[in-house]
Amino acid sequence: MVTKMKMPKVDKIILLVGLMGSGKTSVGKRLARKLSLPFVDGDQEIEKAAGLSLVDVLKCFGEQEYRAGEERVMKRLLKGAPCVLASGGGSFVAEQTRTLAKENALTIWLKADINTLYHRTAGRTRRPFLLGDNETVKNKLQKYITEEYPYYSEADIVVETRDERVENTVRHVIAAIHKFYHKAEKKKRRENAPEQQNGGADASAGNHSEC
């Protein structure tokens, strides 16, 4: 008999971060359904704001303006209502985005190795930063891993994503959210315990002096 996994109660934005091909969109859509939250795709929001595809935004305006637009969109989204938000690839590298995420969101890094990323991204034409032949794509992925993984490591939760069914990854994410909130609650109780003890001691001392 398969037991149904209890869903955590989430009252803030869940921000999925990671490199292109880490599964932010596919995992995010299913996670949002499980948690009864809306799903927002950062890349699609960038395309909507620009009125162009990601490839055309990069082609017409260059990487600097592409990143600036990405940062503006993420700033708006991170000030919004609770949802599951798949970040634009690379957006978490921006300091402003990371700061806002730490204030307003629970950040989850979908961490994948280079072989998984390559398998999921090779030959895809919608990813403007990963265009080229197979060797070029692999070299670019390795470069992004080296440059960006230190930023992603600042996320609240890290979930390793492998070449497995999306539903399995979603279960890992939900279990990690449960664990994160349980740990945070235990820490909060420990921090409050000394205050309660001191309060009890003060009350006892006060009663003793009145006798």
Where are the predicted features?
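Hydrophobic anchor at the beta1->P-loop junction of P-loop NTPases
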Residues: 16
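ATP-dependent small-molecule kinase phosphotransfer cores
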Residues: 41-91, 95-102, 126-127
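Walker A/P-loop
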Residues: 25
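A glycine- and Lys/Arg-enriched "phosphate-lid" helix/loop adjacent to the NTP-binding pocket
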Residues: 103-149
